[in-house]
Amino acid sequence: MRHVCGLDVHKDSVFVCILNEKGVVFQEKFGVLTPELERMVGVIMEHGVTEVGMESTSVYWMPVWRVIDPYVEQKLVNPYFIRQLPGKKSDVKDAEWIATCILKGLVRGSYVPEERIQRLRQYDRRIFDLNDDIVHKLTRLDAALQRCNIRLSNYVSTTDCKSYGDVVDAIARGETSPDALLRCVHGRIVNRHGADVIRSALTGVVTPVDVDVIRQLREEIELARRHRDECQRRMDGLCSEWFPEQYANLQ
């Protein structure tokens, strides 16, 4: 006889309901710490469950999925579709309703990639977040410079360019002389706008507090860049290990 399991996953608990064609076989509430999840897997295996269903609730489903994945086929269900199905009553527990839907074949699972792809996606999302963080911090850094009336960003193509970074590094070391800062700017920029204009743009009113803030923001940006580059290297390494032919074709 076919046995299925519905999981109602919360931040601090997982409610389990195991069903077959005759009705409820087992119900219990488990904790979310790994030993509890492993005990839950043992119960699921003891009852001969062949399919487990759970809702994609925030990130709480992910560790539950990882623990169960080596043992039983799973189905990740969109909560919207579960709630749209007719027949659910207010007094029916969520786990039992999920199990019922799985047993009757009323829902299909969302796409959950294999573990290798999940790892690559984690790195990819991290790189995306770090790039966003870098852009945000560059904006804050330029705002800190504008507060000091350092207007170099008006004359460079991007605040991520080398000249801008060199000027910021000099200020972070405590250098505020316009002539000294001018030497950090690429000659092409100076020639395009004129040395007097760039020198004026670098003549600011900089306090020791400004220097500290600029230095800290610069360090945060560099740290984010190092983390981004590390993630990219790890991602490249996994791609070359797992998909050598495809990876070679992209080089």
Regions found by a protein language model. Give the residues of each.
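A detector of single, family-specific signature residues
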Residues: 1-251
